[in-house]
Amino acid sequence: MSEINHRYLKDNDGNRYFPVTHVDAIRGLESLIKDSGWVEFTPVNGKPNQAFKDNDDKGYNCSYRTIEFLDVKIKTVRLNLSDISYGMTIYNFPDDFAKESQSWLVRTPANRLPVTISLRPSGKLSLSMNYIDRDDWVENNYIYGSFTWIE
């Protein structure tokens, strides 16, 4: 096997160094990245919840975020909601907010099974729960969680 020829740059004292760049040294980088920041939304059903909102918990409200870099989109939905019911619509995003259907599990109280959240290309964000929990879910039971996907 042959050796690959390396060239090292040397500083003024003759010491080798590896040149790298810093994000601040790239002109126009801001124009390549678009960030919506966290956009809070009011659920159409259910109630915004206060779970995990103590100073130490640093919990969040129902919100979403989109970050675009070149042709890549990173999307996140965060939920903190109580007073929910089986099959209810949580929110209606614009059409194509999600190009493909997305589903994920979120946290619930310890005496409940996880709840499945579904987001459809139509923009409908809804939930479903296990049949064991459907009839006796109480107002102060909550869902809490976030989900991120790449398009």
Stretches with model-predicted labels:
Residues 84-88, 101, 105-151:
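Extracellular jelly-roll beta-sandwich "head" domains, especially the C-terminal globular C1q domain
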